[in-house]
């Protein structure tokens, strides 16, 4: 073998041992004829002392080398407590260059700011940086733990196809041409949803998979066209069973990766309550500043803007001290989110109200507003008025922005909860109904017989798991009865013929005694991001793509040649069936 020890594993009890190490030159320092090298491998860094100049004469940063030498205790006063090998050093007797390195496009040591484009272009170099390497190791540890949890709870790991048929799941499919059947296409799965339900029909009962999913979505920050999720499905269960396995997984991960003990059972909050209090279905509970509804308070207001179906407010502590430019910036912030603006009132130190909105309020409203919303002298009150959901969402986003700007968020806290009683349907762009989760989600038991009569108020047996403001898992109890499934299809405007064309294989399977079943999927990239203490999922993916879906490393996506296009049958039109 090339080496006898890993560099980062050497300690004082290795003193006087002869060792052979291999790794990269992380740093070189010359001191009066003696050269000090920081030798790095995957295990860490060790200092190598080179007393013969010819051994290190040609060495440069990131040369890959093999070092033969003797471990010794560092001279007193030269210890380095910042590294695990800081008590010792290796005195080199021989150095072999295994491979040389070209000049680096960016430094790998220190805290220099490096553009993300450069990091992704040279991802293999970025991985040599401790922060990137540690994030990937956290992902590996978390993956191992997840497999242990699922195995300990009797789950069977089953791989589902990556080449399947296109089915409507809310986003566009990535399509793959079939060379042997010109004009026909596979689709890469947006999720294994249909296959995992078929596994329940097949009697597997407890299935899980760490799987890749593919969605051809519009460009969005911190989204990837391919991503990983832990997919779980169980037969003969209700919501409590799904909550139980989800909590077992999350508590074990937080305990073993971060040393954090999450109390069980996790908190639960209905969707409607989350929207009313926080303006979002993924509330960050690490700080307060809850929304306050003022619809009744302004029921008789002379201010036309507040004569709306919903009026709400959120308080910004100390916000009255903002400059006019800062307050104007809030308006731009709101407009960037599709709102007309963000009305505000400033609470002066004497308790009087200022700002453009204050003069439009009645004397009674001005007198009682601060107390109603819990504002103190020096605070600012932001308002949103209009349609309920849109107004709440704007205030929810403002609340989060306030938390960040005012330093209200406890970055050391871990707040997790289940959001339950999710809406079953929502309006689409054409004014029809569409499923919020997917069309196989079961309705709440109290509306099981009537949901089709009033889709807008129907709730589903669906839930999300939220941690620190991030949705990390989503699940539901599924429909397993044909009559109920058809009513859902009818509600979303899917005819029997269309349903048969798109989901016929699943509907056929449901004729053979399907069990009651349910499941959930965990967004693995985002969960690992939190576990690793990173701010973007790109930092916990080995070879991520940019927000525009590009891969700076390989140059993907790329055009294909005319020959590839012809051979794949990209332009072929399938023969139409004749009657």
UniProtKB/Swiss-Prot annotation:
One of its GO terms (biological process) is aspartyl-tRNA aminoacylation. Aspartyl-tRNA synthetase with relaxed tRNA specificity since it is able to aspartylate not only its cognate tRNA(Asp) but also tRNA(Asn). Reaction proceeds in two steps: L-aspartate is first activated by ATP to form Asp-AMP and then transferred to the acceptor end of tRNA(Asp/Asn). It is found in: Cytoplasm. GO terms for cellular component: cytoplasm. ATP binds at residues 215-217, 224, 471, 523-526. Homodimer. This is Aspartate--tRNA(Asp/Asn) ligase. Its EC number is 6.1.1.23. It comes from Thermobifida fusca (strain YX). L-aspartate binds at residues 169, 215, 437, 478. Disulfide bonds: none annotated. Pfam families: GAD (PF02938), tRNA-synt_2 (PF00152), tRNA_anti-codon (PF01336). The keyword Protein biosynthesis applies. CDD domains: AspRS_core (cd00777), EcAspRS_like_N (cd04317). The keyword Nucleotide-binding applies.
